Design a protein with these regions (language model features):
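Acidic di-acidic motifs
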Residues: 365-366, 389
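Acidic/His-rich, divalent-metal-binding segments that scaffold phosphate/diphosphate chemistry
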Residues: 54-179, 184-193, 198
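Acidic, metal-coordinating helix/loop segments flanking the phosphotransfer/catalytic sites
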Residues: 386-404
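Non-catalytic signal-transmission and effector/linker regions of two-component phosphorelay proteins
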Residues: 352-362, 375, 383
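Divalent-cation-assisted or electrostatically stabilized phosphate/pyrophosphate-binding catalytic cores
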Residues: 166-184, 211-294, 303-307
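Conserved small/polar residues in nucleotide/adenosyl-binding loops
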Residues: 408-415
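Two-component/phosphorelay signaling modules centered on CheY-like receiver
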Residues: 368-386
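Non-catalytic interface/linker regions that flank or bridge core catalytic/transmembrane domains
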Residues: 1-118, 304, 312-354, 370
Length: 420
């Protein structure tokens, strides 16, 4: 099977995979021949693409990451705000993925606009589990992580759909309302005795950045749990690769470029590195352009060697880019999409990454009000790195490039880290 974007879908193509609505009902079944009417309707519903059968892709089989029934049960429990059931589904997701020798993340997600919030939560849960497995988490910690991922956006159910799906940029008031969703999610869980404090904190803090510029508490990376840092990466990746009313989807390659560019600013470098080992940049069944002018379909990805897959070529042959004779052939990155803001609840993220070439200023101050004030003054022209103490600053400097300028207040007797 081959993935075809909805813009490239044509009447007469034969569907290779079922398409479902937000209630889990089959809209169009596999084996159905696409018509112009079907394509228009799928486009209206917001599907980014479809899987089709053709001669070149007949030996490409793409396995769903988790069973469709389990995915639909996950949609339902999030949609119905069933917190206890979410915890049960999280455990089933962990058990399912741990029981498999190889976890396949090759399938491009197929969903409509209407089920975005529910599908997003399930996708983030699966991504978090795979990253957590790669980082050696115990089964208990994986259950906590995946439960938090399923619950992380419950607060969005209280935000009007016209704001969630607004085609244009959010107003300042709308953006502030959107930013309350993590706190709303936490409040829904706060009095639940059977939900651990670790899960609640992960839900509350999943929009924190490692440089302290996130929300709601402005925590530095070393103040965040590993679960928080994992959910943040998975959340942004899935948001970027999703088609929304206000943007086209990023390709996996473009989304990973975004994550890499924001390491040390938004994301934990170690988490992103494990993510890149586990998630293919070019999923199976997608067409790619080669540096020698040819095109091919991704037939097989080889673990950490995501940039050197095996391709199905139009003449029926296989091209293994790991073989020595093919080392001079590379996959060309897709053209950069001219999109609007990549995610409604964090419209400044794309700008933040694109402007990493700006001069960097590190500010060290134990007063959060001072840090916020300085950031407000400088962030339009500089990349601002905030640290609440010398220890945090030293930790940042050990793992990242030195800033162009360092501003710090006179250290208190308890904090002589930068004065030694």
């Amino acid at each position: 099977m081959r993935f075809v974007s909805i813009e490239d879908a044509r009447p007469g193509m034969c569907l290779a995979y079922d398409l479902y609505d937000s209630m889990g009902r089959t809209m169009v079944g596999s084996g159905c021949e696409l018509t112009a009417s079907y394509i228009n309707k799928l486009n209206e519903y917001g599907f980014s693409g479809v899987y089709i059968e053709d001669e070149q892709s007949k030996d490409i089989y793409i396995e769903a990451t988790i069973p469709e029934k389990l995915r639909q049960e996950g949609f339902k429990c999030v949609q119905e705000n069933d917190i206890d059931r979410c915890a049960e589904i999280a455990q089933q997701i962990v058990e399912n993925l741990l029981s498999r020798k190889n976890v396949c993340l090759d399938m491009t997600d197929l969903r409509s606009y209407d089920d975005y919030t529910y599908a997003h939560s399930v996708n983030v849960a699966v991504l978090c589990c795979v990253i957590g497995m790669g980082m050696g988490m115990s089964e208990r910690d994986l259950n906590y992580l995946v439960t938090a991922a399923l619950l992380h956006d419950l607060g969005k159910l209280a935000i009007p759909k016209e704001i969630l799906n607004k085609p244009g940029r959010l107003t300042p008031d709308e953006y502030q309302l959107m930013k309350t969703h993590s706190t709303r999610s936490y409040q829904l869980l706060s009095k639940r005795w059977n939900i651990s404090a670790h899960i609640k904190q992960t839900v509350l803090l999943h929009h924190e950045n490692v440089d302290g510029s996130g929300y709601p508490q402005g925590l530095m990376g070393d103040e965040q749990s590993l679960s928080v840092r994992i959910v943040h990466v998975a959340d942004v990746y899935d948001a970027l690769t999703s088609r929304r009313p206000y943007k086209k989807p990023y390709s996996p390659y473009e989304a990973v470029e975004y994550l890499m560019g924001a390491c040390g600013i938004m994301f934990d470098k170690n988490v992103v590195e494990v993510f890149m080992e586990r998630v293919p940049l070019f999923p199976r069944g997608t067409e790619v352009n080669l540096s020698d002018g040819r095109k091919g379909l991704i037939y097989e990805n080889k673990g950490p060697h995501n940039l050197r897959p095996v391709l199905n070529m139009p003449d029926g042959t296989k091209l293994d880019l790991m073989e020595n004779k093919n080392l001079n052939v590379t996959i060309l990155p897709p053209e950069y999409l001219d999109t609007v803001s990549p995610d409604s609840e964090e419209p400044g993220r794309k700008k933040m990454v694109q402007e990493t070439a700006r001069k960097k200023i590190m500010i060290v101050d134990d007063m959060k009000t001072n840090l916020d004030a300085m950031r407000g003054i400088l962030e339009d022209e500089y990349t601002v790195i905030l640290c609440k103490c010398g220890k945090q600053a030293l930790h940042y400097l050990e793992h990242n490039e030195f800033p162009d300028c360092l501003l710090y207040t006179s250290p208190s007797p308890r904090d002589r880290s930068l004065s030694r």
